[in-house]
Regions:
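Bacterial Sec-dependent N-terminal signal peptides
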Residues: 1-30
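Short acidic amphipathic segments
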Residues: 53-69
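Short, low-complexity, polar/charged sequence segments that are solvent-exposed and flexible
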Residues: 51-56, 85-87, 95-98, 120-121
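Short, low-order "capping/linker" segments at domain edges
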Residues: 111-121
Protein backbone atom coordinates (compact mmCIF):
# COMPACT_ATOMS: atom_id res chain seq x y z
CA UNK A 1 0.00 0.00 0.00
CA UNK A 2 2.86 2.37 0.84
CA UNK A 3 4.46 1.71 -2.55
CA UNK A 4 1.18 2.49 -4.31
CA UNK A 5 0.85 5.81 -2.47
CA UNK A 6 4.47 6.69 -3.21
CA UNK A 7 3.92 5.88 -6.88
CA UNK A 8 0.83 8.12 -6.98
CA UNK A 9 2.70 10.97 -5.32
CA UNK A 10 5.65 10.57 -7.68
CA UNK A 11 3.35 10.61 -10.72
CA UNK A 12 1.52 13.72 -9.49
CA UNK A 13 4.81 15.44 -8.84
CA UNK A 14 6.01 14.55 -12.33
CA UNK A 15 2.81 15.93 -13.89
CA UNK A 16 3.10 19.23 -11.99
CA UNK A 17 6.77 19.62 -12.86
CA UNK A 18 6.16 18.97 -16.55
CA UNK A 19 3.29 21.49 -16.55
CA UNK A 20 5.63 24.08 -15.09
CA UNK A 21 8.23 23.39 -17.75
CA UNK A 22 5.60 23.69 -20.49
CA UNK A 23 4.40 27.03 -19.12
CA UNK A 24 8.00 28.26 -18.99
CA UNK A 25 8.52 27.29 -22.62
CA UNK A 26 5.48 29.24 -23.87
CA UNK A 27 6.50 32.33 -21.92
CA UNK A 28 9.17 32.98 -24.56
CA UNK A 29 6.73 32.91 -27.48
CA UNK A 30 5.62 36.44 -28.40
CA UNK A 31 3.30 37.88 -31.03
CA UNK A 32 3.73 41.35 -32.52
CA UNK A 33 1.76 43.31 -35.10
CA UNK A 34 4.34 45.28 -37.08
CA UNK A 35 3.11 48.35 -38.94
CA UNK A 36 4.21 48.51 -42.56
CA UNK A 37 3.11 50.02 -45.87
CA UNK A 38 1.90 47.69 -48.59
CA UNK A 39 0.86 49.26 -51.87
CA UNK A 40 -0.40 46.35 -53.97
CA UNK A 41 -3.89 44.90 -53.63
CA UNK A 42 -2.91 41.31 -54.39
CA UNK A 43 -0.29 41.02 -51.70
CA UNK A 44 -0.92 37.43 -50.57
CA UNK A 45 -0.24 36.00 -54.01
CA UNK A 46 2.40 38.45 -55.24
CA UNK A 47 5.84 36.83 -55.14
CA UNK A 48 7.45 40.24 -54.82
CA UNK A 49 5.76 41.21 -51.58
CA UNK A 50 3.23 39.21 -49.55
CA UNK A 51 4.28 35.76 -50.71
CA UNK A 52 7.93 36.69 -50.34
CA UNK A 53 7.42 38.16 -46.86
CA UNK A 54 5.68 34.98 -45.70
CA UNK A 55 8.30 32.70 -47.25
CA UNK A 56 11.37 34.63 -46.06
CA UNK A 57 10.13 35.17 -42.51
CA UNK A 58 8.97 31.55 -42.21
CA UNK A 59 12.50 30.42 -43.03
CA UNK A 60 14.00 32.65 -40.33
CA UNK A 61 15.07 30.74 -37.21
CA UNK A 62 12.81 31.61 -34.28
CA UNK A 63 9.81 32.81 -36.30
CA UNK A 64 6.83 30.53 -35.78
CA UNK A 65 4.06 32.15 -37.86
CA UNK A 66 3.51 35.21 -40.04
CA UNK A 67 0.44 36.85 -41.48
CA UNK A 68 0.30 39.76 -43.91
CA UNK A 69 -2.77 42.00 -43.72
CA UNK A 70 -2.50 44.38 -46.68
CA UNK A 71 -5.68 46.27 -45.75
CA UNK A 72 -4.50 46.99 -42.21
CA UNK A 73 -0.88 47.42 -43.37
CA UNK A 74 0.42 45.03 -40.73
CA UNK A 75 2.60 41.97 -40.58
CA UNK A 76 1.76 39.85 -37.55
CA UNK A 77 4.64 37.69 -36.41
CA UNK A 78 4.77 35.02 -33.71
CA UNK A 79 8.35 34.40 -32.65
CA UNK A 80 10.52 32.79 -29.99
CA UNK A 81 12.36 35.61 -28.25
CA UNK A 82 15.13 33.22 -27.18
CA UNK A 83 16.11 32.86 -30.84
CA UNK A 84 15.22 36.21 -32.41
CA UNK A 85 14.35 39.66 -31.09
CA UNK A 86 11.54 41.88 -32.30
CA UNK A 87 14.14 44.35 -33.56
CA UNK A 88 15.78 41.59 -35.64
CA UNK A 89 12.37 40.75 -37.13
CA UNK A 90 11.89 44.41 -38.07
CA UNK A 91 15.33 44.53 -39.71
CA UNK A 92 14.55 41.36 -41.67
CA UNK A 93 11.31 42.94 -42.96
CA UNK A 94 13.24 46.11 -43.86
CA UNK A 95 15.71 44.04 -45.87
CA UNK A 96 12.76 42.65 -47.83
CA UNK A 97 11.88 46.20 -48.94
CA UNK A 98 9.17 47.17 -46.46
CA UNK A 99 8.94 49.53 -43.52
CA UNK A 100 8.68 47.78 -40.17
CA UNK A 101 7.39 50.13 -37.49
CA UNK A 102 10.12 52.81 -37.16
CA UNK A 103 12.66 50.83 -39.24
CA UNK A 104 12.59 52.16 -42.80
CA UNK A 105 12.71 49.86 -45.81
CA UNK A 106 16.14 49.13 -47.25
CA UNK A 107 16.32 51.21 -50.49
CA UNK A 108 18.19 48.51 -52.42
CA UNK A 109 15.49 45.97 -51.48
CA UNK A 110 12.73 48.41 -52.49
CA UNK A 111 14.37 48.76 -55.92
CA UNK A 112 14.02 44.99 -56.43
CA UNK A 113 10.26 44.93 -55.74
CA UNK A 114 7.75 44.66 -58.57
CA UNK A 115 6.37 48.03 -59.67
CA UNK A 116 2.96 47.24 -58.16
CA UNK A 117 4.59 46.92 -54.73
CA UNK A 118 6.39 50.25 -54.83
CA UNK A 119 5.04 53.57 -53.60
CA UNK A 120 3.28 55.35 -56.47
CA UNK A 121 5.19 58.42 -57.65
Amino acid sequence: MKNLNLTKIAMLLLVFLSMGAFAQKNKNIKTAAIKTTIYCDHCKICESCGGRILKELYNEDGIKTTNVDAKANTITVTYDERKITLEQVRIKISRLGFDADAVKADPSAVAKLDDCCKKPS
